Regions:
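Helix-to-loop junction immediately C-terminal to a conserved catalytic motif
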Residues: 11
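Conserved ABC transporter NBD signature motif
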Residues: 19-40, 46-54
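Conserved ABC ATPase "signature" region
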Residues: 76, 90-109
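Conserved ABC ATPase signature
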Residues: 113-117, 121
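Hydrophobic anchor residue at the start of the ABC signature
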Residues: 127-128, 155
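Catalytic Walker B motif of ABC-type/P-loop ATPase nucleotide-binding domains
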Residues: 138-142
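Conserved beta-strand-loop-alpha-helix hinge in the C-terminal portion
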Residues: 184-216
Length: 217
């Protein structure tokens, strides 16, 4: 198991060669949870995407900061699946984007190109894109990379607020910070070791991983 492949499997971009990934779904018309898996056919994938929406914040260094797009456009792009390819975003979409921009503390930067943003501002814009569709799950890949410690504290405050409305999977090399912020831990290094709480001792880490590890919380 490698981090990138695992994330793609969770997001439904890859199908696991063995085993399955289950998504717990509760609909408004049926309070009894159902489980969908991503080893499904294309039509079942469509059902999964419609019933279990996911948001994704990619790793910072995968973003092309020269791409000519504004903060507002980045956040609106999180609603692209709610319109056709040729139609425009509606007034409702733009109002939702305005609310997310305010929540991310980006008022006044709506028309600014992403290349002119600080690292923290760009991360907030990308986080806004990930949550604007009200997903059931948000996957965050190294969200604190390239941001200063002051904004890192604010980032985790935002994530705690968002976690009231949806599940979060956070990928990080920063073991110390992750252990303080999350409810459970999965250590990934070819194999995956899951811990239902954050009780991962330094001795356990040294015994089982004699190289840098990645944590999913």
């Amino acid at each position: 198991v490698y981090k990138r492949q695992l994330i793609k499997c969770i997001l439904g971009l890859l199908k696991p060669t063995t085993g399955e990934i289950l998504y717990r779904v509760t609909t408004a018309s049926n309070n009894n949870p159902a489980f969908l898996d991503n080893s499904a056919t294309n039509s079942q994938f469509s059902t999964l995407n419609s019933q279990f929406s996911m948001g994704y914040l990619p790793q910072y260094n995968s973003i092309d900061r020269k791409f000519p797009i504004t903060v507002e456009e980045v956040i609106l792009s999180g609603l692209s699946s709610q319109k056709s390819l040729i139609s425009r975003f509606t007034a409702t979409h733009r109002e939702k984007a305005r609310q997310v921009i305010a929540r991310m503390g980006l008022e006044g930067l709506e028309k600014r190109a992403i290349g002119a943003l600080s690292g923290g501002q760009l991360q907030r814009a990308l986080l806004g894109r990930a949550i604007i569709s009200d997903p059931a799950l948000v996957v965050l890949d190294e969200p604190s990379t390239y941001i200063d410690k002051r904004f890192e504290a604010r980032l985790y405050e935002l994530l705690a607020e968002i976690n009231h409305d949806c599940a979060i999977i956070l990928v990080s090399h920063d073991i110390g910070t992750v252990l303080q912020q999350v409810k459970s831990i999965a250590c990934v290094n070819e194999t995956l070791d899951y811990h239902p709480d954050t009780g991962v001792s330094e001795e356990w880490l040294e015994r089982n991983f004699n190289c840098p590890i990645e944590l999913l919380g």
